[in-house]
Amino acid sequence: ISLASAGESYVLTPGTGSGSSLSYFIPIIDHCLKAKQVDKSPRTRAIVVYPMNALANSQLEELKKFLGADPGTRPVTFGRFTGQESTEEREAMKANPPDILLTNFMMLELLLTRQNAIDQQVIANAKGLKFLVLDELHTYRGRQGADVALLVRRVREALADQLVCIGTS
């Protein structure tokens, strides 16, 4: 938590079920709360990448428990962009970007490369991104690992001057 708060990137290798997501969500939420006091414009400040949609879906439910199920009353907003969303949900995310975007590596790649208006605006809403989290980092091996490494570089180049990268394994 102290590394993330200091703007340092890190990899965390805890045991299964040890609450590793708190090691990145606490500094992300802290940053979002502080940043929103200075700049109230809605934008995505953190992207969390999961290797499987099931993990993103599970984490979405945990965030609802932690931050509140009613989007109108949450101090920090979050949304999922995994390809399972309806056009209406994607349009809503385009118009009202979440502070925290949950996705998978393939959808993040598509967001960066597709030329449709929704995807372009979702990415534009993440300019100035502070955090990029890769959950279950050990699952990206071989060619897929090289693809994800390139994706991290592309995200940094497109969205962030001072990106904090966090990996859990």
Residue ranges and their predicted role:
Residues I1-S169:
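N-terminal helicase ATP-binding lobe
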